[in-house]
Amino acid sequence: NSETHVSDVINDVLQYTQDIIVVNDGSTDATLQVVSRFVGIDVVSYSQNRGKGYAISKGLDHALTQGFTHAVTIDADGQHKACDIPKLVETASRHEDALIIGSRHFGNPFMPQGNRFANRFSNFWFRLQTGIGLPDTQTGFRLYPLLKMGKMRPFTRRYEAELELLVRAAWCNIELIPTTIDVYYPPIDERISHFRKGRDFVRISLLNTALCIIALVYGYPSMFVRKLWKKFLS
């Protein structure tokens, strides 16, 4: 439900591209009506809320079927700034097969402490599962290399899906490149969050446990074999 901010987000993005896909994840407010006012916006919509992971999958699938080679994901809550899109695109122009990660500045005094803890928690598990250190594994502002990723989509359906995608991309030796972005943090009474602290924290913890086990039997061996094969071919 993003009727308050989605119009501003679309207008901001339109300054940089006309190719916009809006995924309406079963909103129950006026989000769909607001989006329908824009001419030429591609909308993927379904009636039941399926979670962020499902929405990402639908959006990436749609972009791929439309012939796009890359796709930028940006949240509809207004926290991400469209003016950072060129940064991600410029980095991708030099690393076309890489997954570009919009990395937030954690020295921002307006960043909630809960966000800082969640990111440190996520970064720790990501390094354990991949051997790679990243400054921000929680950000939703990313540029995905669709052709390189192929049919890779998250199995999980909610917030944990973004971490899952990073881990699986790392296991496939897809280069992960962080690029610094700015983030707007509104006053507490204006913040929109669909994160369910108890239930989603348990889901993320279960996912991390599963990924650690998979990393031992598949992730690390796969990374080693792929690197060895790449070295052999070169």
Language model feature labels by segment:
Residues 131, 154-234:
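Hydrophobic helical membrane-anchoring modules
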Residues 4-8, 29-37:
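Acidic helix N-cap motif at the loop->helix transition within catalytic regions
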Residues 68-79:
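Short beta-strand-to-loop acidic/aromatic patch adjacent to the donor-nucleotide binding site
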Residues 19-20, 70, 175:
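Residues at the starts of beta-strands that form the adenosine-phosphate
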Residues 12-22, 30, 41:
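Short loop->beta transition adjacent to catalytic acidic/histidine clusters or analogous donor-positioning motifs
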Residues 48-65, 82-159, 186-195, 199-205:
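Acceptor/aglycone-binding surface of glycosyltransferases and processive sugar-polymer synthases
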Residues 24-33, 78:
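A conserved acidic beta->alpha catalytic loop
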Residues 1-16:
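Short, well-formed alpha-helical segments that are part of the catalytic scaffolds
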